[in-house]
């Protein structure tokens, strides 16, 4: 049976490490259990977060038919989960895998980035991602205000530290202004951010087309993750 999480105690049993677990944990740290647009659920050892129409599933679910029906009932349009779990949801979802990469390169001792305003960050991000300002601003400002996420920039490039939890950090929304692409700006920013996060395992999720780029700047492949779309 899938039950809604109403208290942090209900998260006991959520693994301390792993991308899915940290995505759910960081989302709970930002929003808690009191919003209808951001909900958390549990089915034994399976944990689920639903933010608007996006879901994250962590752990094996005994009744995958129930879980699939539940996600459809919630009206989710995309699901992030372990690759091994994904086939249980296809159809009606279609599957598009991404790559989890871990930074293994030599970390510079120089910290050269700054913290941009949300508007400054968006001016860079909008050149690489199809995102609307208002929902992005509301979510990002909330995460930053609650100490869950942070932004970093160096004038030409920008990125988000989506979470920094239990010795693991995930970099996301990495973008460079068109006129500065191919000049090493993103690499310098990533190295600077990694230098500011000592003693962490630092990860990024990327599509196949960016594998070579991340390998060149010091990331190594860890595993495939599934993104399910509807």
Ranges and model annotations:
Residues 1-25, 97-135:
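Short amphipathic alpha-helix that is part of the acyltransferase structural core
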Residues 2-5, 9, 15, 23-78, ...:
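Conserved donor-binding loop and adjoining core beta-sheet/short helix segment
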Residues 47, 52-113, 202, 206, ...:
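Acyl-donor-binding surface of acyltransferase catalytic domains
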Residues 63-70, 176-178, 182-196, 216:
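Conserved acetyl-CoA-binding loop-helix of GNAT-fold acetyltransferases
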Residues 89-90, 213-219:
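Conserved active-site tyrosine of GNAT-family acetyltransferases
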Residues 119-175:
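A mid-sequence, solvent-exposed acidic-amphipathic segment
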Residues 152, 162-164, 185-196, 205-207:
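Recognition helices and adjacent regulatory flanks at domain boundaries
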Residues 210:
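Helix-turn-helix
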């Amino acid at each position: 049976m899938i039950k809604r999480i109403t208290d942090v105690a209900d998260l006991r049993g959520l693994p301390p490490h792993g991308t899915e677990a940290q995505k759910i944990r960081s989302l709970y740290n930002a929003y808690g259990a009191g919003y209808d647009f951001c909900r958390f659920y549990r089915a034994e050892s399976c944990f689920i977060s639903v933010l608007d129409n996006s879901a994250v599933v962590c752990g094996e679910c005994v009744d995958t038919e129930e879980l699939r029906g539940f996600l459809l009932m919630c009206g989710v349009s995309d699901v992030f989960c372990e690759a091994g779990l994904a086939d249980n949801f296809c159809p009606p979802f279609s599957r598009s895998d991404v790559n989890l990469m871990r930074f293994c390169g030599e970390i510079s001792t120089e910290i050269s980035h700054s913290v941009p305003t949300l508007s400054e960050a968006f001016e860079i991000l909008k050149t690489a991602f199809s995102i609307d300002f208002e929902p992005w601003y509301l979510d990002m400002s909330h995460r930053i205000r609650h100490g869950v996420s942070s932004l970093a920039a160096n004038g030409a490039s920008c990125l988000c530290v989506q979470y920094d939890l239990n010795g693991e950090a995930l970099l996301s929304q990495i973008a460079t202004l068109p006129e500065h692409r191919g000049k090493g700006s993103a690499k310098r920013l990533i190295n600077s951010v990694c230098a500011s996060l000592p003693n962490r395992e630092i990860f990024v999720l990327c599509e196949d087309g960016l594998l070579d780029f991340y390998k060149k700047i010091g990331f190594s492949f860890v595993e495939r993750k599934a993104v399910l779309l509807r």
